Amino acid sequence: MDGEALLQGLNDAQVRAVASPAASLRILAGAGSGKTRVLTRRIAHRAATGSLDPRHVLAVTFTRKAAGELTQRLRALGLRDTVAAGTFHAIAYTALRTRWHDRDIRPPTVLDRKVGFVARVLPASITRRGVSALDIVSEIEWAKARLVEPADYPDAARAANRRVAIDLPTVAEVFERYEAAKRQRRMVDFDDLLRLCRRDLTDDTEFAAAQRWRFRHFFVDEFQDVNPLQQSLLHAWLDDRHDVCVVGDPNQAIYAWNGADASYLHDFEREHPGAETVRLDRNYRSSPQILAVANCVLDRGAGGALVATRPDGPVPTVRSHADDRAEARAIARSIRDAHAPGSAWSDQAVLVRTHAQTALIEEALHDATIPFRARGSSGLLDRPEVRQAVRDLGGGRSYADTLADLAELTAAAGDTDRGANLGALLRLAHDYQSVDDRPSPAGFVAWLTDTTAEQPDAAGDAVELVTFHAAKGLEWPVVHLAGLEQGLVPISYARTREALAEERRLLYVAITRAQRALHLNWAQQRTFGERRMSREPSLHLEDIDETCARLRDPQGRRPPASPRKRRPTGPRSAPDDVLVALKAWRAGMARRAAVPAYVIFHDRTLEAVAAARPRTHDQLLALPGLGPVKVNRYGDELLDVVATHGG
């Protein structure tokens, strides 16, 4: 391999990242900035220049697919020796198996069906309350990722504002039962593999020496998603060494709810004195118009705004629909309209915030004979609580009993993802009843399977149906976002500043999956179980609407208020007095709604109101950051504040 040849075709920042002589390197790689290309070329460049031996490289990725892609790219670059690449769990398991073999230790059984195992240790009193094993498993996984023991779980969960369907001490009790049952059966789960590997690196000096001799140069991808358990294992591998390169993007940190801690990326230079940081901000994926929308979603001051390199494309669209069913049908029509001759169905994807949204969209795609594929476990029928509910149907009961049971399950699950999924199933149960004169549980199962089944050719060319989280790392020429409403984007249970910031980043991730065209949709009404609820557009859509209007007419300006409607001149308070009053009003509204102040209005919007001193709703609508939804909701109060404090 030629080191200089490996720098060809890279931009200046990428060259710095690939050729940096620093042993400790942090690469802040924005969406679509070519991070995998840079990571593989850095490994290959260091090998070509003699600063590392590929046989002693450990490259950690977050998926098996990413590990495979990294290995293939290194081979294509001419690297003769294969590097060790894999997920934390895969690498830890390989190391442990070697140790167990060398020490003649009988390996424990690795538990691969955690939900079923937890279900067997759940007290009957919990299952009667409609709490599923899946709810408990999520908390156990969060606790283990954060290095929290069962006894410490209640305090840790309270400190982290965890939303749990049952009381925290009961979760801790089930957590302890789960750990005891595993010990009794000599079983370990995937998180235990990391814990055991870290323990053995700390306690077994011979094992640690062998591991540290083998792994001398560390590369970690998606470092913003590392959790404390993974970070502690990385520390154990490194010991007192600092030959480590991490790649991450703070604007794509979307897994704090699952235990991830982006502070490891933020604090990398403090952890590794002398480390260098290179920022990659040139985006090679999305059109300038899509990036403008993505950048407007980020928090002001967050940094990391992306710079476009691709040609211009169409301005993203924002569409309102009467209800969620109309939204699903409109998305299906939009997909068919975008399916030009010679294009593939797989060039398009529908992204949703929650699994429960997929049912109506699957039905609409099915009715439109559009092949689709629910990636991973995105399909409603793949959700454990839905599978269990479907299995429980029948038993000679009437269909009315079936509906009643589903309604009871949905109500018991409350405002959770599980409740939303069961609510989607209940809605489908009512849909089935409207098409079958003699509905039965067995008939519903057959209809459900047919309605939500993948098309025959879905394994090949098919539209992808993916959640925002599952879409990370993927891209499509055309992306349709569904359900951009308050309560979904951001999700209803995101109430802290940190949770709302993560929801903002999640929308940013979803938007930056699009290469050429982006369509954003929301419904004015949405059905949850048996409840039909009015909806309001996501708080982010006002900024997006404003950005799209500017993109459509770069020279456009909102017309000033008509001179006939301007306030008469005369003595009045200084503008700051009005602004102070507006901010005080906003603070009170934010306290009552239990949200950060910027969710009500940005500072720049209040500054515009204070400067313009509007007297009518029309004058409010002429100001930046004020659309019809917010004027209808807050307009009268804004005008009262201005009238009271404006002199």
Residue ranges and their predicted role:
Residues M1-P108, A209, D239, A292-N295, ...:
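P-loop NTPase Walker
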Residues M1-S33, R37-T49, V148-D155, R163-I166, ...:
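Helicase P-loop NTPase motor core of nucleic-acid translocases
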Residues G3, Q8-A19, A23-L28, V38, ...:
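Conserved helicase NTPase motor core
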Residues I27, A31-I43, P273-E276, D281-F372, ...:
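Helicase P-loop NTPase motor core
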Residues P54-E139, K144-V148, D152, T369, ...:
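Conserved P-loop NTPase-based nucleic-acid remodeling module centered on helicase motor cores
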Residues V164, H217, A344, T358-I370, ...:
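Conserved helicase C-terminal RecA-like lobe
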Residues P568-R615:
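C-terminal accessory/binding modules appended to enzymatic or scaffolding proteins
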